[in-house]
């Protein structure tokens, strides 16, 4: 199935919002800082999210990992997109 260009663009936009330093990957600190703008988040919640999304275990969320997560959690991503 071909990727929907509009969906890919939305994922890129959200990913870039989390990737504060623009290095092409999201660190746990970048994830935490961005999530804090959405409300209260604990270090444990950040670690759980990292563990779920960072499937290769390198300590960072790549765009590919983010896209897989976004496709599996479309409702959540739509809510985040509205805020950003």
UniProtKB/Swiss-Prot annotation:
Residues 6-40, 41-76 form the EF-hand domain. Expressed exclusively in mature pollen. Ca(2+) 1 binds at residues 19, 21, 23, 25, 30. GO terms for molecular function: calcium ion binding. Keywords: Allergen, Calcium, Membrane, Metal-binding, Repeat. Ca(2+) 2 binds at residues 54, 56, 58, 65. InterPro entries: EF-hand-dom_pair (IPR011992), EF_Hand_1_Ca_BS (IPR018247), EF_hand_dom (IPR002048), EF_hand_pair_protein_CML-like (IPR039647). Pfam families: EF-hand_7. Gene3D superfamilies: EF-hand. The keyword Nucleotidyltransferase does not apply. It is found in: Endomembrane system. GO terms for cellular component: endomembrane system; membrane. Its main location: membrane. The keyword Isomerase does not apply. PANTHER family: EF-HAND CALCIUM-BINDING DOMAIN CONTAINING PROTEIN. This is Polcalcin Ole e 3. The lineage of its organism: Eukaryota, Viridiplantae, Streptophyta, Embryophyta, Tracheophyta.
